[in-house]
Amino acid sequence: MRRLTALLAAGLVVSVVAASCGRAEARREPADSPRAASSSDATTSPQADRRLSSPLPEPDAWIPRAPDRLAPALDATTRSLRSAIDRWTTEGDVSSGEAPLDVQLLALYQQRIYRMLARDPALADDVVARLSSSVAKEARINVAAGSNLLSLASPVSRPSLIRTQPPEPPGVLLGFYREAEDRFGVAWQVLAAVNYTESKFGRVVSASSAGAQGPMQFIPSTWAAYGLGGDVHDPHDAILGAANYLHASGAPGNYRVALYHYNPVPAYVDAVMRYARQMTRDPRTFYAYYNWQVFVLTKHGELRLTGPGL
């Protein structure tokens, strides 16, 4: 039995959803497996513009609500973020320290836009219809995944009790995902999507109300069965344990069945699959999601707990 915290992906909210999980075997490759997605959809930019087209947004920069202004803002932010990620991954060190400031600020602004769109389906439809084709497909995925998880949201009564910490560098985490993929056959994008959804890549340290612990949110009994003798709080051990559990539950043959055993909530499964599919389409999205921050929903509104300016 295991259950996950509900750190809602797309930085929407933190909520706790208790669930009981078991084991099942699956025998078919799902059509929506992340491995089935083509990376040809991703827009690459080997000659990416080295200069941002506009000043970097402040951490709490105003977001326009009019679709004819919000769509260009999301389009420009996404393109600038892709270029900043290209520079970081080719000229910087993704295995040491934190992301460059431009990546952090652009990712946060993008995340805040998607939070707004996930709460307003009509606005989202209008904005996405105005986006360039290379951004629109990514936007549809992010809005849908965010909406999935928003449906599970519940307010946190005491956000001050939620403990956070800096995550491992993305290059280090990617190495852990690939090691787990090589050992258990679970796509690294699925592991990254679970890690993101459960704890924002390890930013959230607190256990869930159901007692789930660590960056992949295991309850003790499930960890004892699938944790391979490791430390549930260690990112490397937790990622391998998650891959072991997903493999035992049907992955890679049927990711949906495996994820449903991980957390038997259809909206959760849909969200994880969507984020994984987007990272398969464009691996740069992993670095964007990595820089999306922790938000919690309170009775007074949403509150950001991590990231620039705090």
Predicted regions and their residues:
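Basic- and aromatic-lined ligand-binding clefts that recognize polyanionic substrates
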Residues: 198, 202-205
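Alpha-helical segment that forms one wall of the substrate-binding/catalytic cleft
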Residues: 168-183, 189, 202, 215, ...
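Amphipathic alpha-helical interaction segments
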Residues: 105, 109, 193-196, 241, ...
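Short, conserved phosphate-binding/catalytic loop or strand-edge motifs used
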Residues: 197, 212, 219
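Surface-exposed patches in mature extracellular/periplasmic domains of secreted proteins
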Residues: 122-126, 185-193, 206, 251-262, ...
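Glycine- and aromatic-rich loop/turn segments at beta-sheet edges
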Residues: 205-211
